[in-house]
Amino acid sequence: MKNKILFIDRDGTLIDEPINTFQVDSINKLVFKKYVISSLRKLVELDYKLIMITNQDGLGTESFPLQDFSTAHLFMLSVFRSEGVIFDDILICPHFLDDDCVCRKPKIKMIEPWLDKIDLKKSYVIGDRDTDMQLSNNLKIKGIKYKEDICNWLHITKYIIKHNRYAEIIRRTKETKVSIKVWLDLEETSKIDTGVKFFDHMLEQLSVHSGICMNISVQGDLDIDDHHTIEDTGIVLGEALLQALGKKNGLSRFGFYLPMDESRSNCIMDISNRPYLNFKAKFNHKMAGDLSTNMVEHFFYSLCYSMKITLHLYAEGKNDHHCIESLFKVFGRTLRQAIKIEGNMLPTSKGIL
């Protein structure tokens, strides 16, 4: 199985590199880079494997005794481990540049056991030197150059998350043009414009309560009615969510939510690859704002079948606005549960989902 792997430099990237000796040979010289621990913990939670790869010039010689290195290095690892950050491998080249060894970065000799396991599209080399970027080129994966002010661990983590569970789909028909981007793990303000203001408001509720950032742009034949606009938005949004989920390893898969307020609603979801919708809600009027109320069920039907989920969605209430809003909110809350990553196992006994 291919893995999302971060190949991370040590000195200058995980910890400060002493400007005089360039050697972290005592605990007193050990200074962690800002935000590095919390950032790596977040990336581990998103199922990234961590591999430390470092050149340590002359390690084991009189100029850099192994014992001095090990004391600080092992203490560093213990701090990371105490915060839930465990490296899957640690690769160290002890040679000088002039030794012309086979293992020194940016050569890939040390990484050979991992070469067949790298997800090339979602793996990165992270480091502060040009040699780290050369390593990324040699591995044919993206490189991220660490810089304290403009590309620190907050920036790096945000970038990786943004490109992790992400999808973009554009769909054109004679009736509509729908463009949707989704980021499952990025909580930022969404940009939504379907031409139907009430529908925009509902999609914003879905985004907020699911924790999913969505950029949705729709041009449709609203001069006729809102049918194609709502239907095609549901289709494309479902396709985008399905694509962003990827292989589904570690996926929670199931979700349920039962909020109680002026309008009552509940939702049960299974990301099952078996589309089915059981929808129960009645509305008192044909329109809620500029949205046809009969299109609410059709939206969830379209999304359900394109995302390939099993969905039970119920609501009742006297006010159509509140009732519809509760449906989108409860769906978002349930979706938030179901897309959460918990471990690395595929959540099915069938071996495929």
Swiss-Prot record:
It is found in: Cytoplasm. Residues 1-164 are annotated as: Histidinol-phosphatase. Zn(2+) binds at C93, H95, C101, C103. Residues 165-353 are annotated as: Imidazoleglycerol-phosphate dehydratase. Its main location: cytoplasm. GO terms for biological process: L-histidine biosynthetic process. PROSITE patterns: IGP_DEHYDRATASE_1, IGP_DEHYDRATASE_2. The active site is at D9 (nucleophile), D11 (proton donor). It catalyses: D-erythro-1-(imidazol-4-yl)glycerol 3-phosphate = 3-(imidazol-4-yl)-2-oxopropyl phosphate + H2O; L-histidinol phosphate + H2O = L-histidinol + phosphate. Mg(2+) binds at D9, D11, D128. Its cofactor is Mg(2+); Zn(2+). One of its GO terms (molecular function) is histidinol-phosphatase activity. InterPro entries: HAD-like_sf, HAD-SF_hydro_IIIA, HAD_sf, His_synth_bifunc_HisB, HisB_N, Histidinol-phos, IGPD_sf, ImidazoleglycerolP_deHydtase. Its EC number is 3.1.3.15, 4.2.1.19. PANTHER family: IMIDAZOLEGLYCEROL-PHOSPHATE DEHYDRATASE (PTHR23133:SF2), IMIDAZOLEGLYCEROL-PHOSPHATE DEHYDRATASE HIS7 (PTHR23133). This is Histidine biosynthesis bifunctional protein HisB.
